[in-house]
Amino acid sequence: MFEQFNGQKFNLIYSDPAWQFNNKKTGGSMKSGAAHHYKSTMSVDELKAMPIDDIAADDCILVMWYVGSMPQEALDVVKAWGFTLKNMNGFVWNKLTVNNNPLFGMGFWTRAGSESAIIAIKGKPKVASRSVRAVGFYEPESLDEILKHTIFSGTFKIGQHSEKPNEFREACVELAGDVPRIELFSRKRVKGWAVWGNEVGKLNKRKAA
């Protein structure tokens, strides 16, 4: 699956899976918001079976976006990939419409207008910056301490086809440092990042058109 990287290991993995899940209310199959824009999606079992150990360094930080209605499934994927959870809401995207109004999203219980990303670790990765924006003020002394907090809460407009704002990539780098890093399920080439997915470059082409 990751043969193209020739055994290279990464200290930061940023992932936005196209989650596939069953909708018990309708009896049908649904996809996450991002999944509607991918050519293919992956079931939880397929995600769990990904050979992440082939690309994860011994000391590695994982940032993974997940579906709010599937927290346990997300935790199962994190565990299967060999990581330990540090924060279910390490990154939070509060979505705005093109008119700068809070997004009135989908949901059967409440209408979601945000997405969250898990932060998890493998080994003992170092924190490059002690000034990553957080909710509240604190003086962390260790990675375990810094990851007890919500690292970054951003309010940004929704982009093309569920594209996550680039500010989150920048926040990841500020946290982990200028380390070897990869984005999984990427649809956009970004300088400094290795990328993997079946639609790499799709968003670059749209913006260039």
Task: Describe these PLM feature segments.
Residues 1-209:
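Class I S-adenosyl-L-methionine-dependent methyltransferase catalytic core
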